[in-house]
Amino acid sequence: MRIRALFAALGWSLVPTGHATSAPQAHASVQAEQPSQETLNDAYRQSIADARAGRYIAASFGLLDRLHLKQSSQLSDPDVFDQWAQVMSCMTNVPTFNPAKDADFKVPPAQVADLRNATAVPALEEIVKRARRTRIVILDENHLDPRNRAFALEVARALHPLGYSVLAIEALKGAAEDDAERAKMQALVADGHARPSAGYYFDDPVFADFLRQSLALGYRPVSYETTRTNYASDPKVAQGQREKDQADALLRRAVTAYPKQKILIYVGEHHAAERPIAAEGGGVRMMADYLKETSGIDPLTIDQAGLSPLPMNRPDVDLYAIADKKAPRQSMVLMRRGQPLTVGLLAGSVDLQVVHPPLALVHGRPSWLHEMGRITSPVPRRLLPAKGSRLIQAFLAADGNDAIPVDQVLATADGPAPWLMLPHGPIRYAIQDRP
């Protein structure tokens, strides 16, 4: 079952979820009067609050209801659409095309030609080979694609035997003072799993499970985002300060605090760049660049966000439609003339670029969830909705009431329910109904 068919079977009015492109996207859209900016901002903030509280239905469908919109394609604000799409990905595990957004940058024709002629090697093997030569590995993500977080867990598993035992995550909500941050991370280790207060993106069950399983492996968590950035005055200055502050915090809290340990750093796309990003004018140094300078360590930098099926930072060329043919069955690293190839936003700014296989659905769920150690399990019949739509959530029975679900699926009364993908162990269930 393809993504569009999955959403159609669930009765949702969504925009197309095919490859990203700069060309106009044809889709059925009901014209609606656009809300005021104040109304949009209020709905956006409420959606964030609902997601942090685990109210996924309110954060997604409720967002549309507050704006008096019948379907997501009526959203004209790209940031509000991204917020809606992020919450939906927490329930479906797949990203959604944003029709309110144009291409962010142009890809030089030479890069497209190189991509068409590229070869590929298995990603984990190449990452492990190169990770032996350094003490720091930096892996990025597309914030709207949970697939990236599942691959991050694969990388964490593969690197652990090499001595990698510190996991620094940009999304972790820490503290400005180092002592307070250390205490907060110790509490996280004691819990063994993330709570909603752990950070903004941990409402995604896949991200929360990546952290849970990494802690179980013995990784020590580190948070390092300390700057509340004000982009209103000068965005480039603000971004540069944020990148430097991140690198300084990582130097103190990871590199210096654990001098004999190796470190895996998990970041948003831009921060992995070791050189200013040419596609954006090259005017701002990124965290990886600063950390390389201050630590004296040349990190292995890996981009998996740029070749996502629906990248957050959108090129004017559908790069994934070319690259996915290089990775029919497993995640691969691109090569050209015997050297790693990088294209798109981070071309020339990272060491490796990963492309993942095209989405395959099994019982309505992405097959890559199996790589997280999940077992397919039909939804108990007693939990299926008699009418309307219902979010069916699975929690580890031992987790508290404020835990993040280990899995969840959206089901409708008039269609087959996707199966749950569950870890081993006792499970308790919860439901959220769409009014």
Residue ranges and their predicted role:
Residues R2-A8:
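Sec-dependent signal peptide recognition
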